[in-house]
Structures are given as C-alpha cells and as structure tokens.
C-alpha cells in the first residue's frame, strides 16, 4: 500500500513544500534497506511581495492547494508556526489562520510537528546511526543539522536542497525532513 504525504514549512513570505510517497507494503528497518520513501515534488513557494497581506497569503495558499489537487496526498503535515520577530508576528499568524480555515472548509486534516521535535529527531538519528557524536553536532546550526540529516538519510538519492551557489534552501529542506519524520514516526 502506498501513501502520499504533503509537508509544509509554511510561512508568510516563503514556504517549503514537499510531496513524498511511501510504500508500506513490506516492513523495513531503515530507509537504506529499501527505498521506501520517494520525493515526488519539493520546492519553495514565494508569496507575491507586491500584494497586500490577505491577497498575498491567499495566493500562496492557492499554490499549495493546486499541488494538493494534483497529488492528492493522504495527509498534510506542517511545521508549527514560529515567530522570530514581533514585526512579522501578525502576518505569520494571519497566514496560518487562513491556511487552517481553507483546509477546514475543504475538510482536510493537517498534523502539526513542532520545530524542536523535528530538530531533536534529526540529531538523534545522526548520533544513533554514528554519523556524528553529540559533540561534533555542536558545530552545526539548526538548519545545517537538517541538511546533514537529509544527506545521511537519503545517501546517494539526496533531494536537491542547495542552490547552484551552494546556499541551503532551508525551507525546502525542512519540508522534506517533515515528510521523512512523519513516515518514520507514524507510518513505519
């Protein structure tokens, strides 16, 4: 049986998005034993800065729902909202409220995963599988931890999470990581 996961690192300005397909037909101990998760789509959606707040958010939600309609995922997973600066708080809260409302109107379920839970999972994976010691992980910031996790998890099948100039697309990486986390914790 196959299931599709849509995962969102959703925010006001830009949102990482991933659609992954997992094969649940035969149990496996780890990803490397059997390619059980396939990234069908991943990208960063940018909202239109020229628009006022609500139309800007609506445009972003429309893009997400178009992708939902194309892939028909079984579950939507979102990273919990995080507000880094008070100047952006209102718009981030609007964005999440409008997304929740639209999904509710379509009777679509969304699961939320806290950022700290996701990062802790990545660190645990990297230390448990002996890619790094806890001390070695201290050299990385949170964004780099996710990138290192994805490199370790996917190995040679690594999804593209860097620009041509080697800049980490952290929103995209987080969205992919959310799909992997949901698969490993809830579907395996």
Give residue ranges: language-model regions:
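Phosphate- and other anionic-substrate recognition elements at nucleic-acid/protein interfaces
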Residues: 1-188
């Amino acid at each position: 049986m196959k299931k599709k996961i849509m995962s969102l690192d959703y925010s006001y300005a830009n949102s990482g998005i991933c659609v992954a397909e997992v094969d649940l037909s035969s149990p496996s101990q780890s990803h490397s034993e059997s390619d059980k998760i396939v990234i069908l789509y991943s990208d960063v959606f940018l909202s239109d800065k020229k628009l006022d707040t609500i139309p800007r958010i609506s445009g972003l939600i429309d893009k997400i729902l178009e992708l939902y309609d194309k892939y028909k995922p079984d579950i939507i997973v979102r990273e919990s909202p995080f507000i880094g600066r008070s100047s952006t708080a209102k718009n981030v809260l609007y964005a999440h409220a409008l997304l929740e409302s639209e999904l509710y109107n379509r009777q679509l379920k969304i699961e939320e995963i806290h950022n700290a839970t996701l990062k802790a999972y990545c660190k645990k994976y990297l230390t448990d599988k002996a890619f790094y010691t806890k001390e070695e992980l201290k050299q990385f910031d949170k964004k780099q931890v996710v990138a290192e996790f994805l490199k370790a998890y996917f190995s040679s099948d690594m999804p593209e999470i860097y620009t041509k100039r080697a800049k980490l697309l952290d929103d995209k990486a987080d969205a992919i990581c959310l799909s992997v986390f949901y698969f490993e914790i809830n579907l395996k």
